[in-house]
Amino acid sequence: MLMLKNGGKPVLFFEMKANAFHLWKNLNYLIPWIIDWYVNPNNQWWYNWLYKRHKLILVSSKEVYEYLLAKNTRLNIRHLALSLSDRYKITSNTCYEKKYDVILIGRQNPVLKDFLDQYKKTHPDLTIFIPSKQELASRDGYLDSMKKSRVALYATPGIDGGEKRTNGFSQVTPRFLEMVASGCNIIARYKTNADTDYYELEKFCPVSYTHLTLPTKLEV
């Protein structure tokens, strides 16, 4: 989303992914807020040049922010984390009616998916919910699907084959926050980094499932 220039004042715009065709937006009055900085470290010099005219650059990932600082980037960067609107806030009194045991939503981590498949073989009564396109057609429908589910599987993107797509960066995505706001118990797989520390993943799912073993009972 690009916000139009207003009287020469700084303009914030969202850039979903840092890209090599940024040059046309390299204007000093624009402040990019970059969501996915999946830049190959070997090409870092090119992106320093592409973004050099911006007086301020925001990045959503604390992992990326600390990485760029460690590389002595010349860019004036700040960390501005992704979050959810206060209207999704829950309290200890929030209670959603749960219809399904586990939800599978979005891109699945292959290790967690295999773990679930193996568990299902020994626990055939486990209900697994895969929402339809129609159920996910709106944001309300998307969140309602998670609110119906007791357990959700979550993994950061840069592991288990995702490294190629993200160049090894593995930030926490908004889906984790949406699962929390939907009252799901989360089984998570992630590598600890500045981003997982920032969002305090260990408080929600203290074990990163590096070596999965099948429990006798899935606590749902």
Predicted regions and their residues:
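Active-site proximal beta-strand in glycosyltransferases
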Residues: 12-15, 23-39
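Surface-exposed flexible segments
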Residues: 27, 32, 117, 168-171, ...
